[in-house]
A protein has these predicted regions:
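Polybasic/polar functional segments that serve as interface/processing modules
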Residues: 1-111
Length: 111
């Protein structure tokens, strides 16, 4: 199992032909360095494909995902610094749901 303590959304569009080295270069340029057990998400310009880059402390993992239909709910405005994601936001994002509206802690206390 790959341990991921923190997830970061890199909002600038990325060419999905990019491999782990190019993605790592982008992470280093925007954040100053890749941290162990942190995951960095990238999407293409149309937000139809995403890649996840994870530094596990020993090396780098790179995973890709695309939806059969539709696109990922990706921010329209690119920011200089990556955005932090919670686990529930990440879970919603990778299945194509609008993750931006999810609260930090989603707890139902009354019915």
């Amino acid at each position: 199992m790959i341990r991921i303590d923190q997830l970061w959304l890199c909002t600038a569009p990325m060419d999905m032909r990019a491999g782990a080295e190019r993605l790592m270069s982008c992470v280093v340029q925007t954040t100053g360095g890749a941290r162990a057990h942190h995951g960095y998400l990238f999407a293409n310009a149309r937000a139809t494909r995403i890649k996840l880059l994870v530094h596990d402390g020993f090396g780098v993992w790179c995973a890709a995902r695309r939806l059969n239909a539709g696109h990922f709910a990706w921010p329209r405005e690119a920011t200089a610094k990556p955005l932090s994601l919670t686990q529930s936001q990440f879970d919603a994002l990778i299945v194509g749901l609008p993750w931006q509206r999810l609260p930090e802690m989603s707890v139902i206390t009354r019915m």
